[in-house]
Amino acid sequence: MLMPKTALALLQLPPATVAALEKLGADLAVARLRRKESLKTWAQRMGVSVPTLQRLEAGDPGVGIGIVATALWLIQRDGELGMLAAPEHDRGAIEMDVRQAVELGRARDRAAASARLRAARQKA
């Protein structure tokens, strides 16, 4: 029997990300239990198998994003999905933009100083 391949990306997840997925899964399990839904009923509502739901609730990073989105939709938290990677929250890209702007400002300052120096030499 062939074993399914595990994507290298899933094996390289940082521990903090693995912990976040496990917490998300546990929180989704709590949400299901608070609604007094069985694994079987909740899985049917999601359109997945019970083992897939169990993997989701265990924080398995191999569970598809569509399944995660469906679970969030069932607990009315899917609206947050659109903000997860919103550009205005991308701290790394914002920091890069700031560094580039600072460097551009420095380059312009150097160019202006060089131009002033050339102009002063031409007058002399």
Indicate residue ranges for each PLM-predicted region.
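Short acidic/histidine-centered micro-motifs embedded in hydrophobic/aromatic stretches
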Residues: 45, 71, 84-88
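Short basic helix-loop element that most often maps to the first helix and adjoining turn
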Residues: 26-42, 104-106
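N-terminal flexible/basic segments that precede or flank functional cores
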Residues: 1-20, 84, 88-124
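Short, charged/polar surface micro-motifs in flexible loops or helix N-caps
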Residues: 77-80
